[in-house]
């Protein structure tokens, strides 16, 4: 009988997701399913993890991230082998705000991959977890979703959707065996933010952010700001009056 914790990571090739996987496997061998769009990249991640944790069962799934029916089938196939203990929904992209303003297709794509797609995956897993009355759904949002800002409001709008969705899902599952964790990273040193690092931005290490996520998911913490200082920063930004906020170049 397989008593290993069953973990699914959607968007497993993201730097944060990969480091979360490493930390989970360092704790104990697991039954790990890696979901991504690029088969070669997922296999590279899986190969590395198998070396790190030979006793773990690691499988890969190449999947569609935008088509609802394909997402439904992907999740149904994953849960056929048993109830999922943890699903981390980690995929997304960091679009250029100017591109989104000038190109409606780019705008739509940014909203879809950062907002709609994570919600669809979460809802598909929620259906199974509701029946089992067991499991944790962890969604990676962003501090950008806390208040719309001119520098990234399309991305922020998508992540704001994830935030509201997660809040509603938490309300739905309150008092049950299903936990919902909303993760709000600040700017983190990953390939997705390489252009920000080049501009001198202060970025959190991916290792520290992943550590906070894994610890928060284990305890079922409802909201994780990573690093924690972003809770205070975003509380201030959320509560700034418009006449002050509108003068800021952020």
Model-derived features: where do they sit?
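Active-site helix of classical SDR
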Residues: 122, 158
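Rossmann-fold cofactor-recognition segment
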Residues: 51-69
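C-terminal helical subdomain
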Residues: 182, 198-235
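Active-site loop immediately N-terminal to the catalytic Tyr-X3-Lys motif
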Residues: 147-153
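Conserved glycine-rich cofactor-binding loop
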Residues: 13-15
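Residue(s) in the substrate-gating loop at a strand-loop-helix junction
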Residues: 142
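Conserved mid-core segment of classical short-chain dehydrogenase/reductases
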Residues: 72, 86, 92-108, 151
